[in-house]
C-alpha cells in the first residue's frame, strides 16, 4: 500500500505502471548512465574531466572536501572518504591524511598539465591551490588549524635550540607493553644543525603531519569545529586500527585522568602511551609524525608538472625544501649505527660531521617524529620561558612501498630542485638514497615478480641480535611485514601497485630523456637495465594473473579481477651489491584473494602499464586489440580493458565505487583497547578511558553517526542470532568514496589522455552484469556489489525501474521481476522485499532528492529526504 505522503511523488510512475504493457528487458551498453554522462566514456580526457568535476570542482558539494580550508587560495580540505564510518589507517572518514593532501597536489598537477596542453577545457592555476591546501597539514603553514587555547604556537622555537634529544625506548609488540621502558641512552639527530642553519628563519619543519581531524569531531580542538592535528598509532606492531587511542598533537593536559599534580589537573591523553607516574612526565607539548611516502608523492607531482612543461615557480623550491627535510626519514630511530644490534649502543653525536655519521640508512623509513615544549611545568622557575626543549626521532624500519626513487631522482639530479635544497650534503645524500632505493627493489623482488616487505636496523623493535639466517641489506635485516602485523603490512596489493608506478614513470623519463646519473651502476646494472629488469618481471606477473569474467570460489561473478592479497614464503638472499636473476628463487608469493580491488589499486596498476608502454614506444592501436605479443603492448591493452570496465561498472553519481562489505567491522563493537591499570579518565567528548573499554566506548561520538547506527543494528541482530565472529556483519553493505581512490583514478585517466590521446575506452554493446562482486579493501575484507535500483536489469537506474517495481507490486504474476532485479530493487529497508517505497526512492533519485550512493537506505531516511 502507498501512504498518502508518498502518493504525490508516485502518481506519475504509478500511472505509467498501470497502463504499460509487459516490460521487456533490453540489452544496454556496458557503460551505466553515469559512465556515459556528457560522453565521458568516449575518451580518457573526457573521463578525467568528468571525475575531476565531481571530486575537485564540485568536491565540497559531493562530500569530498570540507568547508574548512587553508585560507584564501586553497581548496576545501579533502576528507579521507566522503562517508564517515571508515576504519583503516584513519579511524573516521572525515579525518584527513598527508596521503590525501599529496593526492590533491598530484591531481591538480595533472589537471594543469592537461589544460596547458589543451587536452581538456579550463585553465591552469589549480596546482597552486592544491599545494596551498596541502600546506594545511604542515603545522607552521596551517592557516586555520587549532593552535591551543592561546591561538598560536611558535613552531620556529625549534630552531632556538642547539640540539634535539630523544630517550631510547623499546618498541613492544603489543599495546599492553606500553608505557615502554627507557634505557637511559640519549639520542641526538646529527643533521639537525644543518637544517637549523639552512631553515632557521622558517616556522618549523616543512613536513606534513600524517593525520588530522578535519572538523574537530574528537573535540581535541575544544569542539571548535576547527581543523585539528591528531595522532593514533603509537604502541607496537600488533596495534591494529581498532586498538588505538586517539590523542591531540597539541597536548594541553586538559583531558585524560584527574591528578593531584601541583601544576596541572589532568594527565593528558599521551599518558596512556608514555606514563603518568611522576610529576612532569607528560608536559604541555606539541608532537608531529610524518609519513614520507606522502611528501615524496607531492614532490613527484611537482616534478611531473615540470617535466611536462609547466613553470611551477616557487612550488619547485618548496618541494625541494620538503625533500631536503625528508632526509630526517633516512636515519635510524635513535640515531644508532646501522647494524649495531644493541639497544645500549650510543647514538651519533649531535655535532657529528657528515662523514662520521653512522646512523643513516638512506632509505625512506616509515616516519620521523618531532615535537617540543609549549609551556613546561617548571616555567615559573625558568628565565628562558616557554619552548625550552624539543625532541626528534627517525625510524629503523623501511618498507618497499614507502620508497620513491622517482622523487629521489628529481631531488638529486633535477637542476632546479637539486639547487633549491639549502641544507649541506643534501644532493649527495639523495644520490646515495636513489642508488640504495633501486638496489632495495632489486634485493626484494620475488621469483614471481612482486616485491617482498623490507628491512630494519632494530630487529623486534629492540635492536636484537640478528640470526645467522637473517638476510641483510647494508647491515639491516629482512622483515617480511615491516612496522605492522595486524594485518601484516605487505599482504595488500596496494603496496605493489603504488611503488611500481613510481618505477614505471621513472623508467619513462630515463628512456625519453636519458639517464641523468651519467652511468651509475645499480647492482652492476645501468639504471635503464635495472628498471627494465624490475618492471618486466612484475608486469608479466600481473598480466598473467589478471582475470576477466571471473567467478570466485563463492560463486561471485566479476567483470574483472586482479590479485588482492598475497602471502609470502622464503627470504631474499643477502645483498652483495651485485644483482643476480636467480638469487631470490626461494622468495615467492602466493595469491590468496582475487577481487575487483580498490579503485585506486586497479588505477595505479593501469598507470604503471601505460608508462611502461609509452617508454617502449608502443603504438596507441595496441590498446584496441588483443592480438599483441609484445609485453608492453599487452600491458597497454590490459590497462585499457581494466580502466574501461572499472569506469563502466563502478561510476556512480559522485565518483567511482563498488558496494562493500567488511567482516572485520565487528571489531568496532567488540575490540578491547588496552588502557593501563590505574588509569581512569575521559576523552574530550566524555567517552570513558579506562581498562576494559572498546573501540566504540572511547568514541561515543560515533553513536550519533547514521552509518555507525546501521552497522550496529546489523551487528546486534547477528549477535543475538548466535552467529560467529566471521559472520557478525553479514548483511552489512556500504560504499566508500575514498579520496585517494579518486586520486589514482584521475591520475590514470589523465596519464592515458596525456601519453595516448588517441586511445579510446572500450564500450562494447553487451549486457551489464549486476551480479554480486567480491572486492578487497585496505583492510583485506571481502565485499558484494549490486547495482542498487536497477530493478529491470538494464544496467542503469531510471524511472523505468520504479515503474517495473510498481507493476510487480500491483500484479506480480504478469510483471514478475528477475531474481537479480528483486535484489537490485530492494533499496529501502533492505531485506523486506520490493515495495512501493523502493519505487518512491528510485523516483527521488531521478528528482535529485536522493543520490544513488545513498542506497540501500531506510524508511526513516526516506521520510527525512522528502522533507
Where do the protein language model's features map onto the residues?
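Extended ligand-binding clefts on enzyme/binding-domain cores
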Residues: 57-69, 136-280, 289-293, 317-723, ...
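Cellulosome-associated attachment modules in secreted, modular CAZymes
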Residues: 9, 24-28, 768-867
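Long, well-ordered hydrophobic secondary-structure segments characteristic of membrane-embedded
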Residues: 99-109, 122-135, 276-280, 284-303
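Short glycine/serine- and small hydrophobic-enriched flexible loop segments
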Residues: 106-116, 300-308, 409-413, 501-512, ...
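Hydrophobic core
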Residues: 14-22
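N-terminal module-boundary/linker segments of secreted carbohydrate-active enzymes
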Residues: 28-132, 309, 313-321, 376, ...
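Long C-terminal extensions of eukaryotic subunits of large macromolecular complexes
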Residues: 715-767
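Bacterial N-terminal signal peptides that target proteins for export
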Residues: 2-13
Amino acid at each position: 500500500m502507498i501512504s498518502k505522503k508518498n502518493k504525490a511523488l508516485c502518481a506519475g510512475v504509478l500511472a505509467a505502471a498501470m497502463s504499460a504493457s509487459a516490460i521487456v528487458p533490453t540489452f544496454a551498453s556496458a557503460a551505466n548512465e553515469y559512465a556515459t554522462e556528457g560522453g565521458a566514456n568516449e575518451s580518457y580526457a573526457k573521463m578525467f574531466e568528468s571525475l575531476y568535476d565531481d571530486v575537485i570542482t564540485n568536491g565540497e558539494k559531493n562530500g569530498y572536501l570540507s568547508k574548512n580550508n587553508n585560507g584564501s587560495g586553497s581548496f576545501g580540505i579533502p576528507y579521507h572518504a566522503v562517508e564517515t564510518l571508515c576504519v583503516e589507517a584513519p579511524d573516521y572518514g572525515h579525518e584527513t591524511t598527508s596521503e590525501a593532501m599529496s593526492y590533491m597536489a598530484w591531481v591538480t598537477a595533472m589537471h594543469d598539465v592537461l589544460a596547458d596542453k589543451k587536452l581538456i577545457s579550463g585553465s591552469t592555476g589549480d596546482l597552486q591551490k592544491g599545494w596551498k591546501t596541502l600546506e594545511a597539514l604542515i603545522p607552521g603553514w596551517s592557516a586555520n588549524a587549532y593552535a591551543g587555547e592561546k591561538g598560536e604556537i611558535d613552531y620556529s622555537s625549534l630552531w632556538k635550540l642547539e640540539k634535539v634529544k630523544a630517550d631510547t625506548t623499546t618498541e613492544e609488540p603489543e599495546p599492553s607493553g606500553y608505557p615502554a621502558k627507557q634505557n637511559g641512552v640519549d639520542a641526538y639527530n646529527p643533521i639537525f644543525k644543518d637544517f637549523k642553519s639552512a631553515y632557521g628563519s622558517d616556522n618549523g619543519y616543512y613536513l606534513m603531519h600524517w593525520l588530522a581531524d578535519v572538523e574537530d569531531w574528537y573535540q581535541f580542538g575544544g569542539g571548535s569545529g576547527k581543523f585539528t592535528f591528531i595522532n593514533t598509532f603509537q604502541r607496537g606492531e600488533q596495534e591494529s586500527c581498532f586498538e588505538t587511542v586517539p590523542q591531540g598533537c597539541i597536548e594541553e593536559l586538559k583531558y585524560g585522568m584527574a591528578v593531584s599534580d601541583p601544576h596541572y589537573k589532568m594527565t593528558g591523553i599521551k599518558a596512556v602511551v608514555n606514563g603518568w607516574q611522576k610529576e612532569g612526565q607528560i608536559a604541555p607539548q606539541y608532537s608531529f609524525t610524518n609519513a614520507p611516502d606522502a611528501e615524496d608523492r607531492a614532490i613527484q607531482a611537482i616534478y611531473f608538472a615540470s617535466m611536462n612543461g609547466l613553470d611551477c615557480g616557487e612550488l619547485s623550491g618548496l618541494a625541494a625544501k620538503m625533500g631536503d627535510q625528508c632526509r630526517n626519514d633516512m636515519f635510524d630511530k635513535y640515531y644508532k649505527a646501522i647494524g649495531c644490534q644493541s639497544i645500549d649502543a650510543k647514538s651519533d653525536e649531535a655535532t657529528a660531521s657528515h662523514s662520521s655519521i653512522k646512523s643513516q640508512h638512506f632509505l625512506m623509513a616509515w616516519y620521523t617524529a618531532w615535537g617540543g615544549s609549549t609551556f613546561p611545568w617548571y616555567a615559573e622557575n625558568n628565565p628562558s620561558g616557554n619552548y625550552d626543549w624539543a625532541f626528534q626521532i627517525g625510524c629503523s624500519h623501511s618498507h618497499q612501498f614507502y620508497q620513491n626513487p622517482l622523487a629521489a631522482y628529481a631531488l638529486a639530479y633535477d637542476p632546479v630542485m637539486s639547487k633549491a635544497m639549502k641544507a649541506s650534503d643534501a644532493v649527495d645524500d639523495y644520490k646515495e638514497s636513489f642508488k640504495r632505493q633501486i638496489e632495495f627493489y632489486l634485493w626484494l623482488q620475488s621469483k614471481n615478480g612482486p616485491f617482498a616487505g623490507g628491512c630494519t636496523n632494530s630487529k623486534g623493535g629492540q635492536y636484537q641480535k640478528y640470526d645467522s639466517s637473517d638476510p641483510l641489506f647494508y647491515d639491516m635485516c629482512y622483515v617480511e611485514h615491516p612496522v605492522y602485523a595486524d594485518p601484516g603490512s605487505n599482504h595488500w596489493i596496494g603496496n605493489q601497485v603504488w611503488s611500481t608506478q613510481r618505477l614505471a614513470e621513472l623508467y619513462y623519463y630515463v628512456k625519453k630523456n636519458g639517464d641523468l646519473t651519467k652511468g651509475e651502476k645499480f647492482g652492476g646494472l645501468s639504471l635503464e637495465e635495472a628498471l627494465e629488469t624490475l618492471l618486466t618481471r612484475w608486469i608479466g606477473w600481473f598480466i598473467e594473473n589478471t582475470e576477466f569474467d571471473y567467478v570466485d570460489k563463492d560463486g561471485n561473478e566479476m567483470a574483472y579481477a586482479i590479485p588482492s592479497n598475497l602471502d609470502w614464503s622464503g627470504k631474499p638472499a643477502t645483498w652483495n651489491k651485485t644483482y643476480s636473476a636467480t638469487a631470490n628463487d626461494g622468495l615467492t608469493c602466493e595469491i590468496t584473494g582475487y577481487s575487483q580491488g580498490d579503485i585506486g589499486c586497479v588505477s595505479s596498476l593501469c598507470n604503471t602499464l601505460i608508462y611502461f608502454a609509452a617508454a617502449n614506444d608502443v603504438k596507441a592501436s595496441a590498446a584496441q586489440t588483443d592480438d599483441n605479443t609484445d609485453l608492453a603492448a599487452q600491458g597497454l591493452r590490459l590497462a585499457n580493458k581494466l580502466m574501461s570496465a572499472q569506469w563502466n561498472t563502478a561510476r556512480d553519481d559522485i565518483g567511482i565505487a563498488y558496494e562493500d562489505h567488511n567482516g572485520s567491522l565487528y571489531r568496532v563493537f567488540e575490540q578491547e583497547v588496552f588502557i593501563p591499570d590505574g588509569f581512569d579518565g575521559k576523552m574530550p567528548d566524555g567517552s570513558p578511558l579506562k581498562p576494559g573499554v572498546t573501540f566504540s566506548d572511547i568514541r561515543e561520538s560515533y553513536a550519533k553517526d547514521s552509518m555507525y547506527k546501521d552497522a550496529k543494528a546489523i551487528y546486534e541482530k547477528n549477535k543475538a542470532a548466535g552467529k560467529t565472529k566471521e559472520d557478525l556483519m553479514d548483511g552489512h553493505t556500504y560504499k566508500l568514496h575514498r579520496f585517494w581512490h579518486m586520486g589514482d583514478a584521475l591520475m590514470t585517466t589523465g596519464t592515458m589522455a596525456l601519453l595516448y590521446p588517441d586511445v579510446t575506452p572500450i564500450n562494447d554493446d553487451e549486457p551489464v552484469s549486476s551480479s554480486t562482486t567480491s572486492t578487497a579493501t585496505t583492510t583485506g575484507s571481502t565485499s558484494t556489489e549490486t547495482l542498487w535500483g536497477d530493478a529491470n536489469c538494464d544496467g542503469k537506474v531510471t524511472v523505468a525501474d520504479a515503474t517495473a517495481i510498481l507493476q510487480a507490486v500491483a500484479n506480480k504474476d504478469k510483471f514478475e521481476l528477475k531474481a537479480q532485479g528483486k535484489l537490485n530493487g530492494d533499496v529501502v529497508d533492505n531485506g523486506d522485499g520490493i515495495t512501493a517505497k523502493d519505487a518512491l526512492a528510485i523516483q527521488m533519485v531521478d528528482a535529485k532528492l536522493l543520490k544513488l550512493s545513498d542506497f540501500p537506505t531506510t524508511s526513516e531516511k526516506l521520510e527525512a529526504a522528502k522533507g
